[in-house]
Amino acid sequence: MAAVSLDEDLREVVAFRIGSQEFCIDIRAVREIRSWTPTTILPHAPSYIIGVINLRGSVVPIINLAERLGLGSLEPEARHVIIITVVEGQVVGLLVDAVSDILTLPPSSVQPMPKIASETTLSFVRGVITLDQRMLRLLDLIGVLPNVRRMM
């Protein structure tokens, strides 16, 4: 019997909250999870870019993920966390309320988005994961951050 890679068997995701809504991203895109750090504002940046932080000598843009997803804007507070991700080679921080879990799931647990979803939703969300009484949206970071290379 041939060995099957972990990628084909299981998917690991980092689950997090924005308000009462739950989302997740592929763990392979996550570099680290850190507490809120005040940012330096960038003039004329899109409204969902809070600013930048210095992360061990690298300038990292911080995205207000709630605003980017159309859920209103989070006012950064000490209780919030930043998920540092790598998207197409660019390091980007995502401001969220809290990280709740690291989950290991079979690929079959990801269901497609309903066909009635808007084009924007379809470009941001790769699928829906139902887990007990919870429903998590699996985000497509490339869809959420289409201009990641032009942010800096």
Swiss-Prot record:
Any GO CC annotation of this UniProt entry: cytosol
Top-rank taxon, per record: Bacteria
SMART domains: CheW
Location relative to the cell: Cytoplasm
Keyword Metal-binding: no
UniProt GO BP: chemotaxis; signal transduction
Main location as per UniProt: cytoplasm
Keywords: Chemotaxis, Cytoplasm
UniProt-listed InterPro entries: CheW, CheW-like_dom_sf, CheW-lke_dom
Limits of the CheW-like domain: 10-150
Annotated function: Involved in the transmission of sensory signals from the chemoreceptors to the flagellar motors.
Name the record gives this protein: Chemotaxis protein CheW
Source organism of the structure: Cereibacter sphaeroides
GN (gene name): cheW
